[in-house]
């Protein structure tokens, strides 16, 4: 059995950050990764000479962002694309009404103003909500207080429903009232024309990463931890919530009640990307996104123009929440037909068949079991930190679901890896030493 100071399970951003900081502090570390690549849910497809991020895409706000700092240090080019947080405005967005016609500037401004008004009203309603309240509950309370006509309320309600689905891949009634508390964008959002996976590969440089090494059992005790083939003084586990909750990954002895209860109040979402490349552009020029209002947008309601990144006319949409589950198992061609039918409702017969279709399948990935975690009703933001509380001075959990301030992001993964490394060491190391 090979012995090291620390075993890190998972070569995603959390695991790689923790490992890099520990190695920098002089510790012996092995990173065990089940996949044949590093990055975890940061995964870039480079087939046919194109760059497509299948997992994480955005830095959601570059102001005071450690991920942005790392990207700069690693020489990763970025492109500003500030619509990833489902903002109602700020960048050009073509809104289409329930009748399939584009809203004019005045109608768009009125709709956006209503969304902003409700968002402002939501804050105090959420703050005073019951522990088991859902985002649906607080939305309805805030809407009722506005006294708007039914159709006006319906459009804003619909926007919040779609935002919940696009931000967390879950229906609004299944998300805790506090589930979007950290959905705040500070500064521009950016994407990576050369792929987000450059962050993972850069963090992995110089580390002892064992690919194709599936860990299904972690044994820990006061004197250390073992996994098949390895022993260590401490272990950092960075597998996603969906894996932690599965029978295929066992921690013995089990997690203490505090961590186990926090874990039980989180769930992995259903959230898939659909990338469509077309022979020519047919949608509105000079817009970042196209959005469909009204009941026809129940499935496909938002498309993001990736042409600047791709070099060919390209739209990105999402199968989120119930839609992702409904199309699970569909062929990419069938998904494309469904999406294209909706686009033709907006743009008519000029919409051609796509020349290329990519549909992700994170729900079916045994090492992810979804895209990222969300807070169920009854959960609190404290659950993220409770999950990360060190166990016995030996076992440490890290990953996007263990960071309170900005969960479900690469930022959360990076910071959680830093926190785990500091807990292992027993002192604080600068996070920037992971890339400087």
Predicted regions and their residues:
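FAD-dinucleotide binding site
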Residues: 1-436
